Amino acid sequence: MEDLLARARQCLQHAAHIAVLSGAGISAESGVPTFRDAQTGLWARFRPEELATEDAFRRHPERVWDWYAERRASLAAVQPNAGHLALAEFERRHPGRLTVITQNVDGLHQRAGSQDVLALHGSLAEDR
């Protein structure tokens, strides 16, 4: 195991640029519900086609807006965790060397201080 860690450290030290791929697992540690967990996931309570489609928005815009407002409110109660903070600190110490590519829409990487974040699915903090 130590050899593996030493090799990883060496790769990171010599890399010109590092891309970190992030998903639901990192934010689950902060208490953000995932979409896929069978018992507690967001889709355990709602069907995607009822809230997360253009057709749903056209039929029941108030329901969709309310659902997103509820999600935004729940995110206001959570904080970035050690994983988010470690990535932000790495970026601070090594400017221009780290990009976080995330599927998450919670904005916790940005709240932790990460600047170079590509949010593949957008952000609940921004309406488009």
List where the protein language model places each region.
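Conserved catalytic core of sirtuin-type NAD+-dependent deacylases
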Residues: 1-128
